[in-house]
Every structure is written in structure tokens, then in C-alpha cells.
Amino acid sequence: MDIDQYMTDVGRRARRASRSIARASTAAKNAALEAVARAIERDAGALKAANARDVARAKDKGLDAAFVDRLTLSDKALKTMVEGLRQVATLPDPIGEMSNLKYRPSGIQVGQMRVPLGVIGIIYESRPNVTIDAAALCLKSGNATILRGGSEALESNTALAKLIGEGLAEAGLPQDTVQVVETADRAAVGRLITMTEYVDVIVPRGGKSLIERLINEARVPMIKHLDGICHVYVDDRASVTKALTVCDNAKTHRYGTCNTMETLLVARGIAPAVLSPLGRLYREKGVELRVDADARAVLEAAGVGPLVDATDEDWRTEYLAPVLAIKIVDGIDAAIEHINEYGSHHTDAIVTEDHDRAMRFLREVDSASVMVNASTRFADGFEFGLGAEIGISNDKLHARGPVGLEGLTSLKYVVLGHGEGRQ
């Protein structure tokens, strides 16, 4: 297969389809989502058979259990896909919304209209459910999409693509609105991320090595995040009860997510009251504690151990594991400075009863999501009321934070006049 020619053809068809889907009615888009949901319910057996072949190959390659689990399309996973499609169908359609209309002295009205981005390339790894999640959000937001999943899920994704195409056709929409790259050749990714003539934005969903490669090689703009080095700062005016709840949930609710706390900062004045019970709780749950000298002294006095001495690298590390870095700081100034120096601009939280300090933290911490008296685990499109998300961005341009339907659109200016000419 000539990869360059193949990807150029995929891009050309996506661009053509993007013009049709951009003007599609809400009813047609919702009908397509419902048709895909019914197709998955109808053909669940065939989907599971295709997925079983992917899973068997993954096991033959010796891939670990966690990878195989992400790859597997269980009955529960298929049910979640169907529910997700129907949920997206219920979301308000952002396309065509008008906002900020105002009259100018010249007599014209100036406002903004929400429009699709165009063609979105999604690059992801071993989760076939992303095929449906991404297709649904791109479709509802009026975008064409090119999906490039991991090679290990190729049969699963191809089977899902067939059902998506059937659903689009049933609703009278172009089947090229959603295309799955049907080759495992890595050169396809290289071509996709440089096709500026056909692709408007890339959304990568994967590990750090994938994101770093795309940062270095992509010519198409990206909506992405590289790391989730999230902090909780416990202020010396915090409620100890709230601090224990927030810090426990932020770390131990799930270890492998990008919105999990990786560094705990505690104000010196409240450290004994907070770290003693927290340290015992973390050790009971099997969390390794990497601590600075001050935190070590407090925790050892409380009988908490074993402890590991933290290095500078620990403050810069996204563990995605039951490991937590802990540092005692002099106060909010030092906490904000540490977060802005070592964080990844993803999600950070303060626990405090002091309103002024809370507002200062919200203003000065340079992250996509900043929280007061709440777990970092709330940084999620569903929890934020977006209905669903295609990913989380810690960039500063375009979308920032959880990216839902609106994040897959842009605003253009519209002018309404009555024959006026500029004087």
C-alpha cells in the first residue's frame, strides 16, 4: 500500500464530507447517532468476535493484563458505548448558535456564530471505545473525523467503522464523515499529522511517548495535554476534615488517570494535624510516600513509614501509580510558586476556609482547571456538565480543560446590516 496516496485520499474524502456534515440538521445528526447505537446492539456478536481476534493477538505478543483489559470489548463496554451515543444525541447542538449580537454606531449588528472546526484527526492507542466516543462528539459538533487507533485494535475499529458508516448512510449523511485508518503502518500517523490541506486539528489520546512524538513532528494544530502533574495544597486555614476527604479521593480514587493528584503540598502550620492521619491512610492503601525532610519529620513522629526521600525529579513526575510526593511549604506564596514551577498546567486544588486565599489561588495558579475544597478528580467533561469529552487540554490557545462539543467548534464573526457602507 502506498501510504502517502492512501492518506491523501482519506483526507480528501474527509474534507469533502466536512462540508456536508457542517450543514446537516440536528435531527439528521441525532438520527445517525441512534442508528449507530442500534447497529451496535444488533451486531454485538460480530463486534465481540472481531475484538476477540485482537485480544488473542495481544495476548500472544505478551502484552500486559492492563493493556488487554483496555482492549477488550465486554458486554458492559458495548452497553456503555450505546449509552454514550444516545447521551450525545440528547446534548444541545452548538452549531449555528449566535452570541454577543450588538448594534454599532454605523447601524450594523456584529455578533458571533459557532461553527465546526472542519476535519479532526483523532490518534489513540488500545481503547476501541474511543472510536465511538470520538466519532459521536465529532459528528454532533458538525465535524468530519479521521480516526487512527492503535494497531492492536485494528479489527475492532474496522468493525466499528462499518457500523458507523451504516448509521450515517441510514440518516442520509455521507459515510466519509467518519473514517477509520485501516492500516497499522506508523507512516499513516506521520502523514495524518502533516496534512494541513485536509486536516484542521489533531486530538491525540495516548501515552507520553505518543504525545511527545506528535509535538515534535506535527504541522497540524493539536488539542492535547502531555502530563497530568496535579497538586492539592492544604492551607493552614483549611478544615482538616475536608482536607482528609479531598486528599484521599484525589490520590486513591483511581491511580492511572491524568487528573489524579501526584504532589501534596501542606502548609507548615497545619502539617501535623493533616499529615499524621493522611500518612496512615495512604500507607494502609499501599501508597508509597516520597517526602521532603520536613514531611519526613512529621510523618515519622506519627509513626508512619516506610518513607522515601523525594528528589527534585519527583516534583516533576506523573506517576500514574500508587506513589505520592509530599512537601511542606511555608504558605500560599510558596505553594503557588511550586505549582507554577513544577506543575503541568492541568488541574490543581486548594483546601482552605479563607475566601481571599481561595480567590488568589484561583487567579494565580496557571492551570486549565483550578479548584477550591474539591478533589482534582472532578476535572472531567461529564462532571463539568459537558455531557462527554474528547480529551483534556492544558494548552492556552483554543480549548482549555475538558474538551466537549464546544471545544470542537470555533466562533466566526457575523455582521447583519441594512445596506450600510463604511464612512
UniProtKB/Swiss-Prot annotation:
Transmembrane segments: none
Chemical reaction(s) catalysed: L-glutamate 5-semialdehyde + phosphate + NADP(+) = L-glutamyl 5-phosphate + NADPH + H(+)
Subcellular location: Cytoplasm
A single MF term (Gene Ontology): NADP binding
A Pfam family matched in the record: Aldedh
Entry EC number(s): 1.2.1.41
InterPro entries in UniProt: Ald_DH/histidinol_DH, Ald_DH_C, Ald_DH_N, Aldehyde_DH_dom, G-glutamylP_reductase_CS, Glu-5-SA_DH, GPR_dom
Keyword entries, A-Z: Amino-acid biosynthesis, Cytoplasm, NADP, Oxidoreductase, Proline biosynthesis
Major place of residence: cytoplasm
A GO BP annotation: L-proline biosynthetic process
GO cellular component, one term: cytoplasm
Pathway: Amino-acid biosynthesis; L-proline biosynthesis; L-glutamate 5-semialdehyde from L-glutamate: step 2/2
HAMAP family membership: ProA
Function as written in the Swiss-Prot or TrEMBL entry: Catalyzes the NADPH-dependent reduction of L-glutamate 5-phosphate into L-glutamate 5-semialdehyde and phosphate. The product spontaneously undergoes cyclization to form 1-pyrroline-5-carboxylate.
PANTHER family: DELTA-1-PYRROLINE-5-CARBOXYLATE SYNTHASE (PTHR11063:SF8), GLUTAMATE SEMIALDEHYDE DEHYDROGENASE (PTHR11063)
Family: Belongs to the gamma-glutamyl phosphate reductase family.
Name of this protein: Gamma-glutamyl phosphate reductase
Organism: Burkholderia thailandensis (strain ATCC 700388 / DSM 13276 / CCUG 48851 / CIP 106301 / E264)
